[in-house]
A protein has these predicted regions:
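Conserved beta-propeller blade repeats
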Residues: 1-30, 37-39, 58-80, 110-129, ...
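Non-catalytic accessory segments flanking enzyme active sites
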Residues: 89-186, 211-214, 218-219
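Short glycine/acidic-enriched loop and turn motifs that connect beta-strands
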Residues: 32-36, 84-87, 132-135
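Multi-bladed beta-propeller domains
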Residues: 1-19, 42-68, 84, 89-114, ...
Length: 377
C-alpha cells in the first residue's frame, strides 16, 4: 500500500520512505485525525502512528525531498516541502543537502523550483533543473565546481518578457481568508483582469510557470488564480467546506473567486469594467456558473473542457460518500449542488458573452452535455 484515503473523512495517508531511526517503521505523510497533513513515523506491523516528526499550523506538508546522491544514500529523505505564500519552502533534516540547495539558489538566475535530476557516484557532478514564473525550465551542469547552462525547455521565451507571480490573501464575504496568486503584466494599473480558477476542483495550484497566465500577462492582463474552498494543501477543513460542513452547495466556492476579483478592484489594481473568467475542466464549469451570476461582475467568460451538467461529477462524490459511510448531511449538500449549481439549468439566466472550447472526442468531459448546453442558450 503506497497511498490510502479515509473516504468518509477525506484524510490521506501515503508512504514516503523508511524511518532512518528505525528501519522497521515507515515515514508517512498523513493527517492522523488532524486538520493539517504532517510527516509521521508509522509501525506497519502494529498499524500505529509512532511519532510526529514535522507538521505546520498554516498548511499541509506537501512532499518529501530525497538525497541527491542515489548511489550512496538511496531513499534517504532529506527534507519535506510546504507552501509558504508562493514559495515552495523546505524543512531540512540534512545539513549537507541544505547547503547544496542554498548554494544553487544563490547562483541560478530566477531560482525557484530547484531540483537535482542526477548526481555522479563521487558527488562531484550534478545535473540541476529550475522552473518558475520567470524561468519556464532550464537545466544546468555543476561539475567540479564549474557551473554552466545545458539548455532551456522553452528557448524561445526570454525571462525578461515573463511576468512575476505574487501570493495574496484576501477576505471572502463571510470572513474566510482566501489565498491566491496574481501574475502582473509589465505595464501600469488598473489592468484588465482574468480570473483563472484551477481545475479539479479538489486539487491545489502549483504557482510556478503557467503558460496561460504568462501569455495573458504578456498581452496586458492581470491574472488571478484563486485558491478557493476545496483547494488542497490548506488543511482538511478548508478542503471539505467546498461541499460539506456548510459549503452551501458550491456557492462559497464561487464567491471566493468573485471576492478575489473585487479585492483587486478595491486595491486599484484592476478595472472593474474589464474583468472576465477563464478556466478549464472544473474551471470551465465555474466560468459557466459565473456567466449566470447576479449581480454580474464580469464582461465575458471562456469555458474550456467544461461540464455544464454536473450530474456525473456529483454522482461520483455521492457514490464515494455512500460507499464509505459518509454523512447524510454531506450527501444532501451534493444534492443541493446538483439542483442549484447546474449551468444547464441556468442557461436562460446567462447575461454575458461566452466562448466555449471543447474537444469533440474528450472522454473525461464528454461533449454531449456541452452541445445540450449550447442549444439551451
Amino acid at each position: 500500500i503506497i497511498y490510502t484515503r479515509n473516504r468518509a473523512e477525506f484524510e490521506e495517508f501515503f508512504i514516503a520512505g523508511f524511518d532512518p531511526e528505525n528501519p522497521d517503521n515507515l515515514l508517512v505523510i498523513a493527517h492522523n485525525g488532524n486538520d493539517k497533513r504532517g510527516l509521521w513515523s508509522f509501525d506497519p506491523k502494529e498499524k500505529k502512528f509512532k511519532e510526529l516528526i514535522y507538521r505546520r499550523s498554516d498548511g499541509d506538508v506537501f512532499r518529501t525531498r530525497f538525497h541527491s546522491n542515489r548511489f550512496t544514500n538511496s531513499g534517504d529523505i532529506t527534507a519535506v516541502s510546504y507552501y509558504d505564500g508562493r514559495e515552495l519552502s523546505y524543512e531540512w533534516f540534512n545539513g549537507e543537502e541544505k547547503a547544496i540547495y542554498d548554494q544553487l539558489k544563490s547562483i541560478i538566475p530566477y531560482a525557484d523550483r530547484i531540483g537535482i535530476s542526477s548526481r555522479s557516484r563521487d558527488g562531484n557532478s550534478l545535473i540541476i533543473s529550475n522552473r518558475g514564473p520567470r524561468d519556464p525550465g532550464t537545466y544546468y551542469l555543476l561539475k567540479n565546481g564549474e557551473f554552466k547552462v545545458i539548455g532551456s525547455t522553452k528557448p524561445g521565451l526570454s525571462s525578461e518578457h515573463l511576468a512575476n507571480v505574487e501570493a495574496i490573501t484576501y477576505e471572502a464575504r463571510d470572513g474566510r481568508k482566501i489565498r491566491g496568486f496574481i501574475t502582473t503584466p509589465n505595464s501600469k494599473p488598473p489592468y484588465p483582469l482574468v480570473v483563472m480558477p484551477h481545475g479539479g476542483p479538489f486539487i491545489g495550484e502549483n504557482p510556478g510557470f503557467n503558460e496561460w497566465a504568462q501569455m495573458l500577462a504578456n498581452r496586458g492582463f492581470m491574472v488571478l488564480q484563486p485558491q478557493y474552498r476545496g483547494s488542497k494543501y490548506f488543511g482538511l477543513d478548508f478542503y471539505k467546506t467546498a461541499f460539506i460542513n456548510g459549503g452551501q452547495g458550491g456557492y462559497q466556492m464561487q464567491d471566493d473567486k468573485d471576492d478575489g476579483a473585487l479585492y483587486l478592484v478595491e486595491k486599484g489594481l484592476v478595472d472593474p469594467n474589464r474583468m472576465m473568467m477563464f478556466g478549464w475542466s472544473y474551471g470551465g464549469y465555474a466560468s459557466l456558473i459565473a456567466a449566470a451570476r447576479t449581480p454580474q461582475i464580469y464582461q465575458c467568460v471562456i469555458a474550456g473542457a467544461s461540464f455544464p451538467d454536473p450530474i456525473m461529477q456529483v454522482n461520483y462524490y455521492r457514490n464515494r460518500l455512500n460507499r464509505s459511510g459518509g454523512s447524510t448531511a454531506a450527501i444532501e449538500q451534493l444534492n443541493m449542488w446538483l439542483k442549484s449549481m447546474s449551468p444547464l439549468e441556468q442557461a436562460a439566466e446567462v447575461n454575458i458573452p461566452i466562448l466555449i472550447v471543447h474537444g469533440d472526442v474528450d472522454q473525461r468531459t464528454p461533449p454531449k452535455a456541452v452541445r445540450k448546453y449550447i442549444k439551451a442558450l
